[in-house]
Curated annotation (Swiss-Prot):
Stated name of the protein: Ribonuclease Y
Location(s) in or outside the cell: Cell membrane
SUPFAM superfamilies: Eukaryotic type KH-domain (KH-domain type I), HD-domain/PDEase-like
Major location (coarse): membrane
Naturally occurring in which organism (per UniProt): Protochlamydia amoebophila (strain UWE25)
Lineage: Bacteria, Pseudomonadati, Chlamydiota, Chlamydiia, Parachlamydiales
Length: 519
């Protein structure tokens, strides 16, 4: 049975092989033909797109070429326009140069003509000069024969007369110019000073080397003295002030030349009297406490003064020195009040003159700084103040204003000059200062002595409490021109040798009297 089925399976196998070969042939034929068609379609579309892209690029290139040609045309037109403008400008310059050349040639021609005329005139003048010299020689010879004098002798006589006339005229001219300048300066200065003083209001204070402390009863005097005087000795030792206990009812007198110590002593004694406990140990405690309080007051006085004057960023030591000025007096005038007054005056005058107001007020506030330490450092208070200001951080302008306010150094700024004026105004105003009688008499005598030292001075009188000096000269020794010179020289001597508030008027009198007797 199996043998009968083998041919059948073989037949089926052969049929399968045949169908497979037929299928492969059919697939290969139809599939290969489809792929070729697809590839042809792709190639065709690619060629079409390439053609369209080439046409588009050619069109874009033509458009860009047209635009570029248009831009080149515009640039060429612009360059051509610029060249035309430059050509026009050069042509105008050539025309101007040509006109200038013509003008120069014309001027040159005129100059040559003038030069020729001048040469002719020079020759003519030389001839006239020669004739004039000859005529002068002849006239001089005739004059010498007629006068009996040589030309040199005549010149000496003429020069002598002219010299005297010139001296007289120059003295008169100097007197007139100086008078006019003084009047004008007086007007301007009076206006500025009057404006400043009218805007200034200050209080007056007087110096005193003694002060009193009120006590409740006479028994307190004994307690202050203490057993065998130990309490009063402790007070004087701790404070450095003399305690005067006499018959003055209800008061103890404190005497001392250091105002700070005197103030400390007054505060300490006042507290001791109020407390009632008075013995050496308690005295030491109270004096130490009073010293601390006074130093706090000094600092407060300095800060208040700086604030009132608008002086910012002062060194702490400068503030303490300013505070000490509250306890110092000059001719009865409180130095700190005087410094504030000078600062205010300088600020007002600086405003009138258009100067630096802050600098002026700062100089005015610090100008008497040296008076706070004059008992500790040798030298004038102006120079001491100058050195202290530089040492404590002030600039050269401020230090110079301090140092030159008594003319001990040259001023560097106008504000420094203002300090001298404001200081004199503050010192010389009514009631500002009180001068001791001995100093007053000494100053008057010195004023008259200086005047009598000049040659030709007959008499000298100090008038108006030393505000004026009147001088009578000998008319035979001093002429009118010499009167002016004498007044000027005497003024300089007074400024150099005397110290005085305000100003001194110098009046020179020359009077010639001729007396004859009829017999």
């Amino acid at each position: 049975m199996i043998e009968n089925q083998v041919p059948f399976y073989l037949l089926i196998f052969l049929v399968g092989i045949g169908l497979g070969v037929l299928t492969f042939w059919a697939y290969h034929r139809f599939a290969l033909g489809g792929f070729k068609r697809i590839s042809k379609d792709i190639i065709s579309r690619a060629e079409q797109e390439t053609s369209e892209l080439r046409k588009t690029n050619e069109l874009s290139l033509k458009q860009k070429q047209v635009e570029y040609q248009r831009e080149l045309e515009q640039m060429w037109q612009q360059e051509r326009k610029k060249l035309q403008q430059e050509e026009e400008r050069l042509k105008q310059r050539e025309d101007k140069l040509e006109s200038r050349m013509n003008l120069v040639e014309k001027k040159l021609s005129d100059t040559e003509k003038r030069e020729a005329i001048l040469i002719g005139r020079k020759a003519q003048l030389d001839e006239e000069k020669k004739q004039t010299i000859e005529s002068h020689s002849k006239l001089l010879s005739i004059l010498e024969k007629a006068s009996g004098l040589t030309s040199s002798e005549a010149k000496e006589i003429l020069l002598s007369r002219l010299s005297n006339e010139v001296k007289t005229e120059s003295a008169n001219l100097i007197r007139r110019i100086r008078k006019e300048a003084e009047e004008e300066a007086e007007k301007i200065a009076s206006t500025i000073i009057a404006t400043s003083i009218n805007r200034l209001a200050v209080s007056c204070a007087s110096e005193s080397t003694v002060c009193t402390v009120t006590i409740p009863n006479e028994d307190m005097k004994g307690r202050i003295i203490g057993r065998e005087g130990r309490n009063i000795r402790a007070l004087e030792r701790e404070t450095g002030v003399n305690f005067i206990i006499d018959d003055t009812p209800g008061a103890v007198v404190l005497s001392g030349f250091d105002p700070v110590r005197k103030h400390i002593a007054k505060m300490a004694l006042t507290e001791l009297v109020q407390d009632g406990r008075i013995h050496p140990t308690r005295i030491e405690e109270v004096v130490e406490k009073a010293t601390i309080n006074v130093h706090k007051q000094i600092k407060q006085y300095g800060e208040d003064a700086a604030l009132r004057a608008g002086a910012m960023n002062l060194h702490p030591d400068l503030i303490n020195l300013l505070g000490k000025l509250k306890f110092r007096f000059s001719y009865g005038q409180n130095v700190l009040d005087h410094s504030l007054e000078v600062s205010h005056l300088m600020g007002l005058m600086a405003a009138e003159l258009g100067l630096d107001i802050r600098l002026a007020k700062r100089i005015g506030l610090l100008h008497d700084l040296g008076k706070a330490v004059t008992h500790e450092i040798e030298g004038s208070h102006a120079i001491i103040g100058h050195d202290l200001a530089l040492k404590l951080g002030e600039n050269k302008e401020v230090a110079n204003g301090i140092g030159c306010h008594h003319h001990e150094m040259a001023p560097l700024t106008i504000e420094a000059d203002l300090c001298s004026a404001a200081d004199a105004i503050s010192a010389s105003r009514e009631g500002a200062r009180i001068e001791a009688v001995e100093e007053y008499i000494k100053r008057l005598r010195k004023l008259e002595e200086i005047a009598l030292e000049f040659a030709g001075v007959d008499k000298a009188y100090a008038m108006q409490a030393g505000r004026e000096i009147r001088i009578v000269v000998l008319p035979d020794q001093v002429d009118d021109a010499g009167v002016v010179n004498l007044a000027r020289d005497l003024t300089k001597r007074i400024e150099q040798e005397l110290s005085y508030p305000g100003k001194i008027k110098v009046t020179v009198i020359r009077e010639k009297r001729v007396v004859e007797y009829a017999v």
